Amino acid sequence: MDALSQAISSGISVPYKNNSSSLVPSHGLTSLILRKSRSPVNPSSRSRVSVRASEIQHSKTSASSIDLSDPDWKLKYEKDFEQRFSIPHITDVLPDAEAIRSTFCLKMRSPTEDFVGGYPSDEEWHGYINNNDRVLLKVISYSSPTSAGAECLDHDCSWVEQWIHRAGPREKIYFRPEEVKAAIITCGGLCPGLNDVIRHIVITLEIYGVKNIVGIPFGYRGFSDKDLTEMPLSRKVVQNIHLSGGSLLGVSRGGPSVSEIVDSMEERGINMLFVLGGNGTHAGANAIHNECRKRKIKVAVVGVPKTIDNDILHMDKTFGFDTAVEEAQRAINSAYIEAHSAYHGIGVVKLMGRNSGFIAMQASLASGQVDICLIPEVPFNLHGPNGVLKHLKYLIETKGSAVICVAEGAGQNFLEKTNAKDASGNAVLGDFGVYIQQETKKYFKEISTPIDVKYIDPTYMIRAVRANASDGILCTVLGQNAVHGAFAGYSGITVGIINTHYAYLPITEVIAYPKSVDPNSRMWHRCLTSTGQPDFI
């Protein structure tokens, strides 16, 4: 594993707890949550069991020190939450950094060569965001811990407000546009909408007045590989890139050490870095941010979460997810037609989702043609009286065909572990889609029932397409707000949509662990209602 991957993967411990119903510390709520946990199929295979938010205590939280018998515990909780979700600012280490009037004004949508009076401004314009504006993180007030998906701070489910910083342009900025050299990188795998985000970061930077904008090719690797040169970017260069999938800048995993990256940034004069990537990439961005603070250099590092798995904490969704679901349901529809047209036809579709089954769940719901949906978060047996194969036999006998949708991370306990890692330090998964296809054929052969199995794996097809309209809008706003955050002097932050509003969060709060499907949630229950599948345990 390279030095950057080591920085990404270090420091986060995820203990496993198996409490049938207990109060346990939660990073997600920074306090105590009452949550019923399911027991795994095989207690010895803990590595396969997804860890819920209620089973994790983040190193920064002081939740365990909050005494619920204290009459002021709510106030203490709110202060603890506010402190943890405060967003880093360059004045934290550079208190003398000068704030100037913003150069961003919507009455001047296109950049001009000369600004009258120095910079465009309109004292009567009410388009700026106040630094004290907040967005509510949790919007449901649960009346009972038994409510579906309930996240309660105590046995009474007391309501406590959790506020995070609203995203958008500020009236005061901390960078002069003529002194800015902004760089954009895209890391990890492809995702619909990458070019859309790049495009609007560039356009918004130009509206602020920045003329020195570059793209770093192939992720963090572009900072150290001497054969790779930075790409000059402008509105003209990026004007139509959103019409294609992929990334104009290219992607890769891993990269050089954090110190090498910051050395390269200093040599190039980069003082704004926009990082598009998932949890691992954001961990790297946070390490870069910390190194810049350590050196006391004026640099804004801003992330834009990128993962079609939709496994970023706290956010409604990440860009590319809607497009991925839309493309995934096309594969499911094809599997249905193949299965329905064959005698005893069975369609098996494997979709992306290493640790979370959001794509499989949502695509199953969207298609309405899935009979069995298997995700990493929900334990299941293949064999036995309550197993998947027994139910599949029932479907063939009663319907004549069936469609199975599996997330790539599901069923890993049935496969042999290799302990192999990819360049980002992620475990290389076994192919459960192929495995369940083989087991299905074997099972029906043993019971002398002829079947016709069709296996579809659209993994790379669903992520290489251009963004749909919904994701296009999301990417546009995320790109704009990333630039607003950087000019406002924030660093070590990421931008996302939370309860339909856009907000800034400290990177540390979104990389603690991957978000996953809650088996007690209404959305998973809706999926079960759609498929009609039983519990396979």
Swiss-Prot record:
GO cellular component: chloroplast
Marked site positions, Important for substrate specificity: G280
Associated pathway: Carbohydrate degradation; glycolysis; D-glyceraldehyde 3-phosphate and glycerone phosphate from D-glucose: step 3/4
Origin superkingdom: Eukaryota
Regulation: Allosterically activated by AMP.
Residue list for modification Phosphoserine: S147
GO terms of molecular function: 6-phosphofructokinase activity; ATP binding; metal ion binding
Cofactor(s) annotated in UniProt: Mg(2+)
Catalysed reaction, written as an equation: beta-D-fructose 6-phosphate + ATP = beta-D-fructose 1,6-bisphosphate + ADP + H(+)
A Pfam family recorded for this sequence: PFK
Transit peptide: 1-52
Binding site for ATP: G189, R253, G254, G278, N279, G280, T281
Protein family membership: Belongs to the phosphofructokinase type A (PFKA) family. PPi-dependent PFK group II subfamily. Atypical ATP-dependent clade 'X' sub-subfamily.
Protein name: ATP-dependent 6-phosphofructokinase 5, chloroplastic
Protein encoded by which gene: PFK5
